[in-house]
Amino acid sequence: MAYFVYCIECEDGSIYTGITTDVARRFEEHAMGKGGHYTRAHKVKRVVHAESRTTRSEALKREAEIKSWKKEKKLVFISASRARHKKGVK
């Protein structure tokens, strides 16, 4: 089973990072107020990044890495990731 590390942009401009096995389902849970405490307080806007990992352990390590970054680094990472995705490069 694949695990995904995802980043959601919230309406206040903040970035929430989490892991799941189903990004679309998890986003809907956040949008309905059934996600984490953070997204109950910060309304979600859109998924801005998702990447897969083979194991839950790998996903948790990557989630922790991204969460440790300052907002500016997250925004640069997301922008570069989206640019690569548009070009079809992973």
Q: What is the predicted function of each stretch?
A:
Residues 1-40, 44-53, 57-77, 81-90:
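GIY-YIG nuclease catalytic motif and its immediate N-terminal context
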